[in-house]
Amino acid sequence: MAKKSMVAREAKRQKIVDRYAEKRAALKAAGDYEGLSKLPRNASPTRLHNRCRVTGRPHSVYRKFGLSRIAFRELAHKGQIPGVTKASW
């Protein structure tokens, strides 16, 4: 389980990215790189990191499900992820 402060920091970054998305796109299209540099650092989407929605784990997160490999495996075994079954051939 990740620290709550790290999960909160990531959520805060996401809000800032959403808030400045249109302004960033307009500045980028106009080629105003000085204006871009005056925006907050956390307004850049490259500063975001995918985290597991269940555990907050930052590594090995499947984008399609938003879960880490560990949480995905546990939920899949319990049958709580629709359409996911254990492979057998």
Curated annotation (Swiss-Prot):
Keywords tagged on the record: Ribonucleoprotein, Ribosomal protein, RNA-binding, rRNA-binding
Regions crossing the membrane: none
GO terms for MF: rRNA binding; structural constituent of ribosome
Top-level taxon in the UniProt lineage: Bacteria
SUPFAM superfamilies noted in UniProt: Glucocorticoid receptor-like (DNA-binding domain)
A GO term from the CC aspect: small ribosomal subunit
A family per Pfam: Ribosomal_S14
GO biological process: translation
Segments forming a coiled coil: none
Keyword Zinc: no
Function: Binds 16S rRNA, required for the assembly of 30S particles and may also be responsible for determining the conformation of the 16S rRNA at the A site.
Family designation: Belongs to the universal ribosomal protein uS14 family.
Subunit relationships: Part of the 30S ribosomal subunit. Contacts proteins S3 and S10.
Protein name: Small ribosomal subunit protein uS14
Biological source species: Streptococcus pneumoniae serotype 4 (strain ATCC BAA-334 / TIGR4)
Gene assigned in the entry: rpsN
